[in-house]
């Protein structure tokens, strides 16, 4: 029995060696796509952008380097908002301007003030948009002495919190005909002679993609894992800064 098994093993190893030596690595297929919009990153930002674009009639290709969509958004609990419809139903009194003033003070004014203002003033619209798309929220106070700004994401198809939001958005992308390519990280932007961005180069384990597009949206996530980008954009020593 041992001799028989050893012969089988030897034959299998020999066959594998021959295949490796003769066949070599598989050559990636070259694929070219043309679309209206290509979005890099299928977290909550990328998924939301894909839904909005597809609803307006655009053809959308959504790229994600992981083999699942959502990224860190799957582990989120909720989102911040002031003066949302849910806040009004609760008779919460905090205004966007009050929240904006408090946030600037808490961050000692070391922030991009116009961007922070846009975020706070647009937060209610974000929640209202999600609610119109079937996302459920419960508004809570993070602590007894804070205002009720935390909108905890409710259940969707047996999932809760961030995973529920991601599942909801992915279902809508599928219904709207968005082409989602997981396991396919973007590698570089395509530019024309004038320097305008006209597409994306991407690569999966089996395919090399050239995706020509009228517009490119970068929604690839936080810079907090890159010390160089934190230093460049946040103007802080990333070695001593924890996000």
Where are these regions (language model features)?
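Conserved N-terminal/central alpha/beta ligand/cofactor-binding core
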Residues: 58-59, 65-179, 183-185, 228-237
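Short glycine/serine/threonine-rich phosphate/pyrophosphate-binding segments
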Residues: 46-49, 225-227
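Conserved beta-strand-loop-beta-strand element in the redox core of flavoprotein oxidoreductases
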Residues: 190-210, 216
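Extreme N-terminal leader/targeting segments of oxidoreductases
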Residues: 2-37, 55
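Gly/Ala-rich phosphate-binding loop of Rossmann-like dinucleotide-binding domains
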Residues: 50, 54
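Beta1/beta-strand and adjacent pyrophosphate-binding region of the FAD-binding site
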Residues: 31-45, 61
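Glycine-rich loop(s) and the adjacent beta-strand/alpha-helix scaffold that form part
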Residues: 204, 211, 215-243
């Amino acid at each position: 029995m041992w001799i028989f098994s050893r012969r089988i093993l030897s034959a299998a190893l020999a066959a594998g060696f021959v295949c490796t030596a003769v066949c070599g690595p598989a050559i990636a297929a070259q694929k070219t796509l043309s679309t209206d919009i290509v979005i890099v990153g299928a977290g909550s930002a990328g998924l939301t952008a894909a839904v909005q674009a597809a609803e307006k009639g655009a053809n959308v290709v959504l790229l994600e380097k992981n083999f699942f969509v959502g990224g860190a958004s799957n582990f989120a609990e909720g989102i911040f908002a002031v003066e949302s419809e849910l806040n009004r139903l609760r008779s919460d009194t905090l205004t966007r301007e009050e929240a904006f003033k408090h946030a600037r003070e808490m961050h000692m004014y070391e922030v991009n003030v116009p961007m922070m203002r846009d975020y706070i003033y647009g937060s209610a619209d974000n929640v209202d948009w999600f609610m119109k798309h079937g996302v459920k929220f419960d508004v809570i106070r993070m602590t007894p002495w804070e205002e009720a700004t935390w909108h905890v994401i409710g259940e969707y198809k047996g999932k809760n919190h961030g995973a529920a939001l991601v599942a909801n958005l992915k279902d809508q992308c599928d219904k709207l005909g968005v082409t989602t390519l997981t396991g396919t990280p973007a590698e570089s932007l395509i530019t024309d002679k004038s320097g305008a961005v006209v597409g994306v180069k991407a690569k999966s384990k089996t395919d090399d993609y050239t995706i020509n597009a009228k517009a490119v949206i970068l929604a690839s996530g936080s810079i907090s894992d890159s010390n160089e980008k934190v230093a460049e954009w946040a103007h802080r020593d990333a070695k001593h800064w924890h996000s």
